[in-house]
Amino acid sequence: MLPSFLSARTGPVVLPRVAGVAALAMGLLGFLASCSKDDETTAATPSKITVPQRALSPEGIQYDETNKRFIVSSRTQGRIGTVRDDSTYTQLADDPRLVSTIGLNLDASRQRLLAAVSDIGVNTTRSTATTLRKLAALAIFNPSSGALTSYVDLGALRPALPHFANDIAVDAQGNAYITDSLSPIIYKVDAAGVATVFLENSQLSGGTGFGLNGIVYHPDGYLLTAKTSDGTLYKVPLATPTAFAAVTSSQSLVGADGLLLLDNNTLLVVAGSQNTVFRMASTDAWTTTRSSGSFATGAVSATTITRRNGSDAFVLYPYTATSPRFAITKVVF
């Protein structure tokens, strides 16, 4: 199509020099503005990204604002990869010790990507009798190169217990807190890589099911963590973890998985077995909470959720362990 400042007539058009230049400039501005609008439309954030990766079964997700990409884990293959808005998947990191990568935490200010490593038997290539339901580890990577910089064995702290390292929170000092879904434990790995048992209490047990799952750090100095089996949400003070308490809630959070602290008073909870993302609100520093909204995911085995562009939230749909695809979907309440 011809720009509007060019005539479609067959004969020559003679314009005064000044008028001609002005018309040319106006036409170019209009043309460039049109291009700019097209570019903005192209760059718009998609509401859903479907990724054609067979049997990847991603469990954890983070959004890398600096590089404009999602980072996902894999229960069935162990490797960590990135996803662009055009659905392109690229492997970022892998190591033979990564039987199943579960929760992720992108600690951007310290240039670290933290991954919880476990073995529940779904990676048939790497699972062994010595790791099955016994492996709990924290792997730390350079998020730019994918290089593994540290691997911390957490299960060795309680070798007689079953283990499943699940999710990770990082506090303001760089300490990492990792939930164990098969034992009633929260581990702590300090910035120097030293691992300890931060909290161990039978109340945190999931019995024959999954116990603690999602975990987030609250800037007022405590952790919020959810138990999958019964949906209990716990508040755990960093200074006195044994003084942890259940958060009183009128909303059932049974099946609670990933958490996202959207702001100090708003927590998003992915309840996979309920096919729902709940928006929970608190006005008393998480002594109590109530639901202020929900988002229906459908039967997609939703696991966890991440922040993008400050306030947007995207939930991960792994579907099944053998699915030919997975999806990342914007949550709208």
Task: Please tell me what each predicted stretch does.
Residues 2-5, 25-51:
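Bacterial Sec-dependent N-terminal signal peptides
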Residues 45-52, 88-94, 147-158, 195-207, ...:
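A short beta-strand motif characteristic of beta-propeller blades
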Residues 53-67, 75, 96-121, 155-176, ...:
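Beta-rich, blade/repeat-based domains predominating
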Residues 75, 118-120, 181-183, 228-229, ...:
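Short loop/turn segments immediately following the C-termini of beta-strands
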Residues 78-80, 122-123, 138, 184-187, ...:
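Structural signal for beta-propeller blades
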Residues 83-88, 142-147, 189-194, 237-242, ...:
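Short loop/turn segments that connect beta-strands within beta-propeller blades
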Residues 116-133, 318-326:
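Short, conserved, GDST-rich strand-edge loop motifs in beta-rich repeat architectures
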Residues 129-173:
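Asp-box/WD-like beta-propeller blade repeats and closely related beta-sheet repeat scaffolds
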